[in-house]
Each structure stands twice: as structure tokens, then as C-alpha cells.
UniProtKB/Swiss-Prot annotation:
InterPro entries: CIS_SH2, SH2, SH2_dom_sf, SOCS_box, SOCS_box-like_dom_sf. The gene is CISH. The lineage of its organism: Eukaryota, Metazoa, Chordata, Craniata, Vertebrata. Pathway: Protein modification; protein ubiquitination. This is Cytokine-inducible SH2-containing protein. The SOCS box domain mediates the interaction with the Elongin BC complex, an adapter module in different E3 ubiquitin ligase complexes. It comes from Bos taurus. Coiled coil: none annotated. GO terms for biological process: cytokine-mediated signaling pathway; intracellular signal transduction; negative regulation of cytokine-mediated signaling pathway; negative regulation of receptor signaling pathway via JAK-STAT; protein ubiquitination.
């Protein structure tokens, strides 16, 4: 006996109109057997397996602290006598061109991202190095490789005084090749020639500041410098309070 069964097309047609064929009616499977898993189940398992990484809290910047730090630096620089304000790189070059090596001054930077620039006479002529400000500290601008070794200071005068003392120690040392001051690049803003040329490294030597003629330092200030060079702590001196306060207003040797 031969059993005749309808082809696929009729079966498909029957399924399309909603009638189930006889061979399918005998297979009564529960509807929940083949339900797919949601993608969220896999994601939840993956999240549970991997430990959560602690988020780094962003460093809070105190605007008032920055303002006080910058104001204190400006106050120190005005007292120093070797802060030249808003002169240009060309004017600084003219002032330092005939000065001995190691003569320096501090001026306002022409770059909008920097506050100050250190102009110094080197063996290659007047050179300008920007002074960075970040996190209430100042440091000399440098390339990425030497930046981790560059020290930071609470004000510009402390920064300059440190490198002046380092150069003086190098001069007194028996090893002339010992270099305490780092090799720093010439900023693009003040580099001679094409500003697109890459900055080149130069070894700084800070010896003496170039004092402005218009800001002649008083005899009191010169005496204060001598006292600061000879005395570590002015509080130990038997001085009147007013005189001690005057010494604290500029606790530097330059």
C-alpha cells in the first residue's frame, strides 16, 4: 500500500491560514521550551564576574588658592627689581645682548597659556624659557622626557633662586661637567627664525639678575637681601616687630 501525502506547498498554505496539520498535532510541545534568553542575562553575568574598578576622583581646584598664589608671586616679583613686566622677547634680547652670560630677567609671557617667561643670556645668546603654572606651583617649561625631573615651586622668585644656587654650586664644584640645572628647550614663541621650527635644548646658567633702572632698589631692600643671605631664620633675631615683618615680606636673597 502506498500512502499519499500532500506536498510542502499545501502544508505551508495550511500553516499560513492558521490550521495545524495532523502530523503536527501529535507533537504537543510546551510553548516555553524554546524561549530564547534575553541579552541582559549574559550582560549581568559578565558584570558580576569582573570586579568593579574604583573611579578616580577628579582633583578639586580651589580658585581662591590659585588667586592667592598668583597674587603673592606678583608681590614678590615687584619687590625684586628684576621683573620687567610686559616687555616683548625682542626688547628682552636687546637688554641682555651685551650682558655677561648668566644675566637674567623675568617678564610677562606673550603666550596666552603662560604667565611668565625667564629671559637669560646663554652662550648662544639671549634665550627665553616659559614658566608653567599648575596646581598652585611654578616650574620651568621643558620637553616631555625631562618634565618629571623638573622641580615645582610655590612662587617664581623661589624657582629662580633655586637655580641660581644650583649654578653657584656647580661653579664651586671640582667637577665642571656636573649639571644640576636641566636642559630646557627654547619656547616656540621666542625662538629666533621660523616659529614652526622645533625647539632645541639649551643648558641654562643663572648667575645674576638684570635690575631695571626705573625700579632702583632702596637701601632698606639691599640690607634685607644681605640679612637673608646671612641668616636662615629671621625670627631668631632680636628685632622690632615692624622690622621683622619687613624682612618676611621678601624672604629671598636675589
Amino acid at each position: 500500500m502506498v500512502l499519499c501525502v500532500q506536498g510542502l506547498c499545501p502544508l505551508l498554505a495550511v500553516e499560513q491560514i492558521g490550521q495545524r496539520p495532523l502530523w503536527a498535532q501529535s507533537l504537543e510541545l510546551p510553548q516555553q521550551v524554546m524561549q530564547p534568553l534575553s541579552a541582559g542575562a549574559f550582560l549581568e553575568e559578565a558584570v558580576e564576574e569582573s570586579p568593579a574598578q574604583p573611579e578616580r576622583e577628579p582633583k578639586v581646584v580651589d580658585p581662591e588658592e590659585d588667586l592667592l598664589c598668583i597674587a603673592k608671586t606678583f608681590s614678590y616679583l615687584r619687590e625684586s627689581g628684576w621683573y620687567w613686566g610686559s616687555i616683548t622677547a625682542s626688547e628682552a634680547r636687546q637688554h641682555l645682548q651685551k650682558m655677561p652670560e648668566g644675566t637674567f630677567l623675568v617678564r610677562d609671557s606673550t603666550h596666552p597659556s603662560y604667565l611668565f617667561t625667564l629671559s637669560v643670556k646663554t652662550t648662544r645668546g639671549p634665550t627665553n624659557v616659559r614658566i608653567e603654572y599648575a596646581d598652585s606651583s611654578f616650574r620651568l617649561d621643558s620637553n616631555c622626557l625631562s618634565r618629571p625631573r623638573i622641580l615645582a615651586f610655590p612662587d617664581v622668585v623661589s624657582l629662580v633662586q633655586h637655580y641660581v644656587a644650583s649654578c653657584a654650586a656647580d661653579t664651586r664644584s671640582d667637577s665642571p661637567d656636573l649639571a644640576t640645572t636641566p636642559a630646557l628647550p627654547t619656547p616656540k614663541e621666542d625662538a629666533p627664525g621660523d616659529p614652526a621650527l622645533p625647539a632645541t635644548a639649551v643648558h641654562l646658567k643663572l648667575v645674576q639678575p638684570f635690575v631695571r633702572r626705573s625700579s632702583t632698589r632702596s637701601l632698606q631692600h639691599l640690607c634685607r637681601l644681605v640679612i637673608n643671605r646671612l641668616v636662615v631664620d629671621v625670627d631668631c633675631l632680636p628685632l622690632p616687630r615692624r622690622m621683622a615683618d619687613y624682612l618676611r615680606q621678601y624672604p629671598f636673597q636675589l
